[in-house]
Amino acid sequence: IGKPARNVKRADALDYLAGYTVCNDYAIRDYLENYYRPNLRVKNRDATTPVGPWMVDVADVPDPSQLKLRTWINGELKQEGSTADMIFDIPYLIEYFSSFMTLQPGDMIATGTPEGLADVVPGDEVVVEVEGVGRLVNRIVSESEFFAARGKRKTRGKQHDQALDQRPGSR
C-alpha cells in the first residue's frame, strides 16, 4: 500500500498501491488443529513468510490481473497459474479490507496461491515467481536449525529440540 486507504472504491483501488513483490506465505500444517480455529500457530511462525527480493513500482506492472504465477520445489514445477484465476482480485481485496480498517503505507496484502499445494521438508529449495515482478528463492530449514543459526536456542530444552529433529522430514 502506498498511501492511507479507508473505504476505497474498487474502481480507485489500484491508485492506493505502491507496488508488487513476491511473497511465499508458508503454512506449518503440523499445527493445523481444526478448520474453524484461528490458525495463528499455522501461519505466524518465525521466518515462514519470505518476501522479495524487491518491490516493483506499480507503474511498471501495467496489468496485474494477467500475471503468470509459478512455484518450483527442487527444480520441479509444482504450481502454475495466473492472477486472472484469483478468487478475489487486488481491487476487490483493497476495497474489502479498507471497508473495516485503514490500510497504511507499507502494508502488504498476500493474495493466495494457485492450485497445487505441496509439502516441503528441510533441505528443499523453493522458487516462487510472479511474471514481471520477480523470483523469490529460499531453502527450507528445520526450526531447530533456524534458531541454532541465529544463536537463539529455544528455551523449551533439549527434549523439545530432539522431538523437533525426529519429526518426519526434519533432517
Give residue spans per PLM region.
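Short, structured patches in soluble enzyme cores that scaffold and shape functional sites
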Residues: I1-K3, T21-Y26, M55, I73
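Short helix-loop capping/hinge motifs at secondary-structure junctions, enriched
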Residues: A5-K9, D60-D63
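N-terminal accessory regions of nucleic-acid-interacting proteins
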Residues: R6-Y20
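Catalytic-pocket segment enriched in acidic/His residues
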Residues: R29-R171
